[in-house]
Structures are given as structure tokens and as C-alpha cells.
């Protein structure tokens, strides 16, 4: 596994290792974060489409792309939705160290809060980010502790910390951590059960993948992709002779309002999983991803 960037001229080498190499895909990281950030989501669906299907623009095969949201460097997932700015004072470098372009969003308060509305919005975004990662083609990498809300108090460069700031507290408990772990476990169970979500070759033909408008269930055209305000769509991944099992449709709404939903094709669909409550075969909640599987 390569971390395909380094200092200096020609240091960035994403997609150039080839062969049996897999590579951390930072374009996926930034594209996924932008989807759910209020200041960066305009045009984000168009930019993310290739990344969601395994980054064919960068890799010969989708399994060469190691998709991730967070890593050993940078914010934890909990901190990504809780801090607008890095807080690295404990590192002794006057907060000059660490990455500045984090695409993080605190949802209205910097750091921990007791505001139930802010907490609910953060949890909503965390679940949407996790489904963005786990439902994408490629190899998902989940940072240890993100599945239970691990925080480093806004420190995004904790390599020099060996104490409570960076340690994982495996004894910690609470409804929020337990519910998040259960959500991740449920998603991984579905991944194992639905081969169409784990494909080894890129999807190029309409028989494999198709994109649809959510409001009327009509297949997307060039004008839809050229709309800079596009904030919702669905993608159908079809099973076939080499990929048995149910087909799936993944519906995304990165906008601030619920949308009517009409699912594509002649299939009968059932909701398998959603990042937000209130999703049905006819309703796509705001800021959410829904996963449907075919019953045919």
C-alpha cells in the first residue's frame, strides 16, 4: 500500500504505482468531505461520481484505490464534524504544524457542545460520510476509533502525543458510540452480502451502472450533469452473470431539503440502509444517503 505523495518536485504520484500496488486515495478523501460541507458542495456530486465508482481516472482497477475519510494524520472523523480549525497547541509549535485545508465543519460550535441540535447534525453528517466511504467501489479504509467517535480535541497532528489526547479509550461507553458501532457493523454486513458493491473491474457500460434524477426517476442527461446546483441523484448498480445477487440503487441528497424520490427502472426496491431517519422508497431526506436493493 502506497501513500503516494511526498515533498518536492514530482512528489505527488497518485495512480502511478501500478501493478499489484494499492494507494491511499486523497482525492476520494477530499471529494467525500466536500459533498457534505455547506461551503464546498456546489458541483461536488459531479466531481465525486468517478471517485464513487472506483476512480477510473486514476487507477486501472477499482481495488487499487484505498478510499478513506481520515488517517493517522489529520482530524479524526468526530473532530472533522466538530472543529472548523485545528487546535494543535499541545504540540509545542504555536499551532503552525498540521494541515490547514481540512474541509471540516463544526456545525455551529467549535468543539464539544451540549446543544442537542448541533449534536444531531454532527451525527447525521458522520453517518453520511461513513456510507459515502463504505458504499463506494474500491477498498474502504476506516481509521481505528472512528467507528466509536474517537476525538483528539481538534488536534490534527497528534504524532507527537502519547497520552490521553491520542489514546483510544476502549472502555468508554455511551449511546452515541454504541449506535455508531452498530451502524458501521450493519453496513459492513450488507457489503459482504451484496457483491455488486464490491466489484473488481471498473463499471463503464449502462448495463453495469446508470445515473438517475431523483424527482422523476428519469435517466440523467448531459444538461443534468452540467447543472452546477445539482444536489441529488441516484446511481443504480446492476447485477449480471459475473456479479450475482440483487441490484442496488444508492440515492444521495447533499441539499438542505427533503426531496421526493422515484427509484429507477422496473425493479421492486426495498430500503436496506439509510444515513438518516425518514427515508422511504418515495422520500429522500436532506443531507442523506439511502441504499436500496432489488427484490426481483
Question: Where are the regions that the model predicts?
Answer:
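Conserved alpha/beta catalytic core and glycan-binding cleft of carbohydrate-active enzymes
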Residues: 1-144, 148-149, 157-161, 250
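Carbohydrate-interacting/catalytic domains
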Residues: 15, 113, 118-123, 127, ...
Amino acid at each position: 500500500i502506497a501513500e503516494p505523495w511526498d515533498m518536492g518536485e514530482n512528489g505527488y504520484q497518485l495512480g502511478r504505482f501500478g501493478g499489484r500496488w494499492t494507494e491511499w486515495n486523497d482525492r476520494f478523501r477530499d471529494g467525500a468531505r466536500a459533498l457534505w460541507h455547506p461551503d464546498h458542495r456546489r458541483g461536488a456530486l459531479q466531481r465525486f461520481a468517478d471517485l464513487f465508482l472506483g476512480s477510473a481516472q486514476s487507477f486501472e482497477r477499482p481495488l487499487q484505490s484505498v478510499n478513506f475519510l481520515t488517517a493517522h494524520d489529520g482530524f479524526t472523523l468526530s473532530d472533522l464534524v466538530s472543529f472548523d480549525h485545528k487546535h494543535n497547541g499541545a504540540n509545542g509549535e504555536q499551532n503552525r504544524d498540521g494541515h490547514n485545508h481540512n474541509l471540516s465543519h463544526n456545525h455551529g460550535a467549535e468543539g464539544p457542545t451540549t446543544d442537542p441540535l448541533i449534536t444531531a447534525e454532527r451525527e447525521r453528517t458522520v453517518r453520511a460520510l461513513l456510507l459515502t466511504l463504505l458504499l463506494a467501489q474500491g477498498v474502504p479504509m476506516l481509521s481505528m476509533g472512528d467507528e466509536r467517535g474517537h476525538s483528539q480535541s481538534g488536534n490534527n497532528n497528534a504524532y507527537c502525543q502519547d497520552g490521553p489526547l491520542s489514546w483510544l479509550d476502549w472502555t468508554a461507553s455511551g449511546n452515541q458510540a454504541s449506535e455508531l458501532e452498530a451502524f458501521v457493523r450493519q453496513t459492513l454486513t450488507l457489503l459482504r452480502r451484496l457483491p455488486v458493491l464490491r466489484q473488481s473491474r471498473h463499471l463503464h457500460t449502462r448495463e453495469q451502472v446508470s445515473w438517475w434524477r431523483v424527482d422523476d426517476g428519469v435517466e440523467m442527461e448531459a444538461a443534468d450533469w452540467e447543472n452546477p446546483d445539482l444536489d441529488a441523484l441516484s446511481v443504480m448498480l446492476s447485477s449480471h452473470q459475473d456479479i450475482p445477487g440483487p441490484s442496488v440503487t444508492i440515492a444521495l441528497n447533499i441539499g438542505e431539503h427533503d426531496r421526493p424520490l422515484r427509484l429507477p427502472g422496473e425493479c421492486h426496491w426495498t430500503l436496506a440502509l439509510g444515513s438518516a431517519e425518514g427515508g422511504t422508497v418515495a422520500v429522500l431526506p436532506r443531507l442523506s444517503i439511502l441504499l436500496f436493493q432489488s427484490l426481483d
